[in-house]
Amino acid sequence: VYESIMKLYAEQGIIRFKVPDDGKWSLLVFTLCFSGGTIRGIHFGEDDGEPFAPLSADLLNPDAVSAFIEITHERYYDVLKEYFGSTVIAMFTDEPCILGRNPQKGLIPWTDDFLEWYISAGNEEISLPALWTDCGEKTEQIRRNYRKALDSKLEHAYYRQISEWCEKHGIALTGHPEKSDEIGLLKYFHIPGQDIVWRWVAPEDNKGIEGEHSTMAKCSSDSARHRGRRRNSNECFGCCGPHGIHWAFSMDDMKWYMDWMFVRGVNLLYPHAFFYSVEGEKRYGERPPDVGPNNTWWKYYNLISAYIKRM
């Protein structure tokens, strides 16, 4: 139980523990390590599970995020500054994940100064075992407190910095967080958004009105309304074909998804995707379908674009 947790201290490099009773005790040691998580690279051989997939960065570290902005956003601005605010209207951040993709199992997000951040939010260091083990009735509340502190750290280190950079350079921050129901993390988005993907929302099986993902469109529209933002967005249609056959995604499917989002207050869509080419297996299978020139119903797309434009 929570009340039995004790913090041990090293004396001359040695930690000693004398069992106080005949009960069963566990000794827990917490270690800060790399997650081993990756991101999806832009070249062949750099996707999930592939040998050259780039390692993910520490999104909770403001210095790491600052360096990221310097080598990416600043570079875009150096080359395209004359188009910022006109042709270039926003920067898109796409489901940033703290641990990265496919991290080591059993880890939770952390960074060098997170313990101080966690304690400053009103939590106790001695509560940390509850993040891994059941410590009684306080366990769920401790985990909620941890998640709240984690989200605020991510907001401060990552989203806030990028949002301020975008505002300073005359463009918006848009895109979406990692998970469907993370409405709180939309705080710093000038155009808050979500991602309709993998047919998690669909006309069949009540997927449009039940479950975690059914809140997506309302997350973005409510975030915009509460914060006085004019636009809110959804990336949509990626891997949304029926029965796992994503190239079977039809115009009827597209119409259903658009109506589902529009009726919930979404007023800006990012259709996924318009590919330069679908030649070859890796391109053909890269998060289909193509809703652009490589699709058989491209000649009718003006009907879709006009419908989107009216919203």
Give the positions of each predicted feature.
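Mature extracytoplasmic enzyme cores
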Residues: V1-R144
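Carbohydrate-binding surfaces of carbohydrate-active enzymes
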Residues: D78-A90, D94-P192, V197-M311
